[in-house]
């Protein structure tokens, strides 16, 4: 199940890459696609470790750089905005599913802890990328409105 969900996530990122994106963001996403294949390899081949702290640091640095260009959030936002941002949100939700799958798998099988952390950081990066893409494409974040009944 985990391999299928990783493949689904990778495919959604592939769809996202068909959208007009800044070149530096395309490079990040293409690197992520390769890393997702590596995580699949780790799950398929015993003692095959490809994801490490350097790859996690790469994601965190890119996440922080994009986040520094955005206003801080004080409310929840709804997925949407530009098409590219919507694909980021879709990828983020599948990434969260991958994280749950890997966490559950780790209860019975050996799973690289760095891969779990990478997937967690990837979902955060996809959220920030969605907001960043909305900003550069002149779409506002849509804030969740608490029911005031």
Residue spans of the language-model regions?
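Phosphate/pyrophosphate-binding loop motifs in nucleotide- or prenyl diphosphate-using proteins
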Residues: 1-149
């Amino acid at each position: 199940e985990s391999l299928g969900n990783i493949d689904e996530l990778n495919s959604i990122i592939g769809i996202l890459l068909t959208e007009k994106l800044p070149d530096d963001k395309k490079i990040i996403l293409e690197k992520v696609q390769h890393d997702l294949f590596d995580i699949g390899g780790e799950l398929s081949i015993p003692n095959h470790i490809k994801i490490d702290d350097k790859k996690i640091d790469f994601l965190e640095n890119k996440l922080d750089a994009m986040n520094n260009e955005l206003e801080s959030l004080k409310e929840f936002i709804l997925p949407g905005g530009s098409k590219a941002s919507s694909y980021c949100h879709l990828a983020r939700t599948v990434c969260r599913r991958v994280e749950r799958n890997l966490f559950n798998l780790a209860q019975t099988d050996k799973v690289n802890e760095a891969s779990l952390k990478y997937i967690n950081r990837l979902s955060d990066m996809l959220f920030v990328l969605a907001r960043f893409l909305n900003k550069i494409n002149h779409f506002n974040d849509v804030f969740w409105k608490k029911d005031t009944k």
